[in-house]
Amino acid sequence: MNKKLLLFVFIGAMNIKAIGQAPKIDTVAVSILDRMSAIIGDLSSCSVTIKSNYDINSRELGLVKHSNEHELYLHGPNKLLVKSEGDKGSHILSYNGKTLTYYSRDKNQFGLIPSQASVVDMIDSVNKMYGIEFPGADFFYPTFVDDILAESKNLVFIGITKVGDKDCFHIAGTAKDKTFQFWISDDAFYLPMKMVIVHTAKENNPQFEAVFTNWKINPDLPDAMFEFNAPPNAKKIKMVAKTIKK
């Protein structure tokens, strides 16, 4: 084998490797996610039950599985109610478009956070300032698909599979520090039915899984259900912003 042929083989091998490492963004997967995001964005109201499981690293036990269940109600651009039960305790998040109330059923304590933003903007600011988590919030962001594409190394449509008895589009992807999978209902509404995230940059690769059930589209949700009425003897506490590292 002469030098020219050796050089050709070497360069060809490099090109094959480079092609193999190139990001793969499946247009079918993007189209499904775009459709889901557009439908959710057009909803005037909705409700859904979210069951989540997540891993926490233990020095003695390795990954320990925890779980929570949430009932979420969304109305218009600025009303949200989330009732949560599970390993993180029992609490309620209630937003009436003017004030977010965090109520701990376990401690019978509540705190108030003033806000007059849309639900999405409120979630974003409250999460950054106070570290409060809102289940399923990612799917309600109008930039959901753009955010996924911005960090994805790969995004592919795998095929049709089932979540419970529901046929779903199965989509999987990878990013720098995680892998993720979405199951989107194969029907007229294209609603999220399940998601799994594996944090590959963290010790032991902890996972987060959420299953969405009991979707109700555009239900009649009265404004009164988003108003918080303090239970008897409930104590009002001050909400303390988390320390931001410089």
Regions found by a protein language model. Give the residues of each.
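N-terminal mature ectodomain segment of secretory-pathway/periplasmic proteins
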Residues: K24-Q109
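Gly/Pro-enriched, hydrophobic low-complexity segments
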Residues: G20, K24, V48-K51, T101, ...
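Short loop/turn motifs at secondary-structure junctions and domain boundaries
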Residues: L63, A150-S152, G173-K176
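Flexible, processing/modification-adjacent segments and terminal tails
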Residues: A22-I32, S104-D167, N229-K235, M239-K246
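Bacterial Sec-dependent N-terminal signal peptides
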Residues: M1-I25
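A short local loop/turn or secondary-structure capping micro-motif enriched for an aromatic residue
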Residues: N57, S90-I92, Y102, F110-L112, ...
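A short, terminal or domain-edge coil/loop segment
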Residues: N96-F110, P135-D138, Q207-N214
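Well-ordered beta-strand positions in beta-sheet-rich domains
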Residues: S67-E71, I92, F110-L112, N154, ...
